[in-house]
Amino acid sequence: MTNKPSAATGRNVVVVGTQWGDEGKGKLVDWLTEMSQGVVRFQGGHNAGHTLVINGVKTALHLIPSGIMRPGVKCYIGNGVVLSAAKLFEEIEGLEKAGVEVRSRLRISEACPLILPFHAAIDIARETFREKGGTEKIGTTGRGIGPAYEDKIARRALRVQDLKYPERFAAKLRELLELHNFVLTGFLNAPAVDFDTVYNEAMLHAELLKPMMADVSRELNDAHQAGANLLFEGAQGTLLDVDHGTYPYVTSSNCVAGNAAAGAGVGPGMLHYILGITKAYCTRVGGGPFPTELDWENPGTVGYHLSSVGAEKGVTTGRSRRCGWFDAALLKRSAQVNGLSGLCITKLDVLDGIEELKLCTGYELDGQTTDILPMGADDIARCVPIYETMPGWSQTTVGVTEYDKLPAAAQRYLQRIEEVTGVPVHMISTSPDRDHTILLRNPYAA
């Protein structure tokens, strides 16, 4: 494995989560970066949370691509990302304190919409308003992601490039703040956001951002032509996609592989291999339907085992993740909308010691059976899972790096996932550590 580009055009891999996020994408992106020269974020914002464990040291990233932990690898934030400059510099400073060089290796698209303080204020006020009104909360992270995307779609967003022109920025900000303060004070019963505070902070960030501003689309295309291997790092998961997820309990961007092209400024022909990251069981943070959910709060239950052994706490919010059995019918939907080339099964080791495993292969819905997850939260909430029961294993799989050394029951479990979903398993993760990975087929050589 090497970080040197090939003589011909590079080969590019897209990494996406196939469930509700938190599948372990960060570790796999970091691992695959050993074979790439550039890592690209193409959607979401600092609502994402990627945890890397390298030589026993845990690092949490929210906005900066996971490839930053590999010396010499360039990292790109594409136009599909909504950018909080405040959170970006908080993250940069934390990495620099740990001895990681960031600023010379990070390129930020000038077309990124900005997340500003009033976006988070609206996000939080809306969730409070829903709760007081007796409506179930969406379960947002409260970081302003949704409101920032709303401004983008409404064609009124302030973008990174606007920071280069203070007078233009001020005029746009004043107009935008007038609208949002009207909503905050007149509808959501929340305090107004001060113009000067927002403007002055933005101008401080502008000077720091300027050296990293770039035409990311052009740089990625040039790097590809020069032979660089690129890795497109998805955030959240397919079932949180604004179109294909459990709507309305979703995020505000497209999390599927196809958005790697639009969110980074490359053609779809540059996406050569799609790797779907999938936990060996299911988890979900926040509200919304979850067909295979177990009792994960009471000791002695399988769900509690998954929650405690899997350390299922959200990286971004610290909220406990809901836990349940593996859902192959859900994964079949994810495979369809992403065009998956292969799977990486993570957290296989968490299943160690569970005597009997269940795998959902379909659902009963309104008197009918279906072998694929329906569209939309209302139908999914009415689904009754159809399970296959499989034997578990008592041997430890922690740190196993060869497929043949996995227990026979673990191998059969993985094979059944392949059979039901129609997608081959190409990688398996057996602990959070970077090196505890089984490689069956290299995405960069496939």
UniProtKB/Swiss-Prot annotation:
A GO CC term assigned to this protein in UniProt: cytoplasm
Gene3D superfamilies for this protein: Adenylosuccinate Synthetase, subunit A, domain 1, Adenylosuccinate Synthetase, subunit A, domain 2, Adenylosuccinate Synthetase, subunit A, domain 3
Residues at which substrate binds: V315, T316, T317, G318, R319, S320, R321
Alphabetized PROSITE patterns for the sequence: ADENYLOSUCCIN_SYN_1 (PS01266), ADENYLOSUCCIN_SYN_2 (PS00513)
Keyword Ribonucleoprotein tagged: no
InterPro entries, alphabetized: Adenylosuccin_syn_GTP-bd, Adenylosuccin_syn_Lys_AS, Adenylosuccinate_synth_dom1, Adenylosuccinate_synth_dom2, Adenylosuccinate_synth_dom3, Adenylosuccinate_synthetase, P-loop_NTPase
Subunit structure: Homodimer.
Protein name as it appears in the record: Adenylosuccinate synthetase
Catalytic activity: IMP + L-aspartate + GTP = N(6)-(1,2-dicarboxyethyl)-AMP + GDP + phosphate + 2 H(+)
Gene from which this protein is expressed: purA
Key words, A-Z: Cytoplasm, GTP-binding, Ligase, Magnesium, Metal-binding, Nucleotide-binding, Purine biosynthesis
Cofactor mode of binding and number, as noted: Binds 1 Mg(2+) ion per subunit.
Cofactor: Mg(2+)
Protein EC: 6.3.4.4
Molecular function in Gene Ontology: adenylosuccinate synthase activity; GTP binding; magnesium ion binding
Its job: Plays an important role in the de novo pathway of purine nucleotide biosynthesis. Catalyzes the first committed step in the biosynthesis of AMP from IMP.
Binding-site list for Mg(2+): D22, G49
